[in-house]
Amino acid sequence: MSNGLDIIIVDDDESVGELISRVIKKFYTWGDIHVFTEVEKAINYCIGRDIGVAIFIVDVFLGGASGFYFLDAIEEKFPTAHEDAIIISGNASDDIVNMCIASDVNYLLEKPIKPYALQLAVRAITGKYLEFAKKLLKDPVFAESVSKL
């Protein structure tokens, strides 16, 4: 398990998950990439992690479950799971857009995924954590107050 900001990909189509992983490995260096095809295995992995921060790339339909079910299931361990998620869909209908809005998911990509769109979405989420890390390094009083949480 890395000490960085890992990316967790959940897609019931193994080839899609592996393709997304290969694209991300071309530009992402801040953590490890984990790919899951089974929702329950992904949930168990996430709940068992020491660190409750990651970027999630999740298919909206995962066999018998939804990507939103996955995010809800890990939310106690990962309070920002919805904010740190990129939902992918074969058909981004109004219903899916509305589910994203209702769930606080800000990134929705339609298959086939454009590599630049994926990179920009991952970069936006990563940027939030890099800014926070900079603030911790520059402000020792703030860092101490965060460590007491």
Short names for language-model regions:
Residues 113-122:
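C-terminal output helix
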Residues 69, 82, 92-107:
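Alpha4 helix (beta4-alpha4-beta5 surface) of REC/receiver domains from two-component response regulators
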Residues 44, 68-81:
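Short amphipathic alpha-helix used as the core "switch/output" element in two-component signaling
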Residues 35-55:
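Acidic, metal-coordinating helix/loop segments flanking the phosphotransfer/catalytic sites
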Residues 14-36:
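Two-component/phosphorelay signaling modules centered on CheY-like receiver
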Residues 123, 127-149:
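CheY-like receiver
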Residues 38, 66-69:
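Acidic catalytic/metal-coordinating carboxylates
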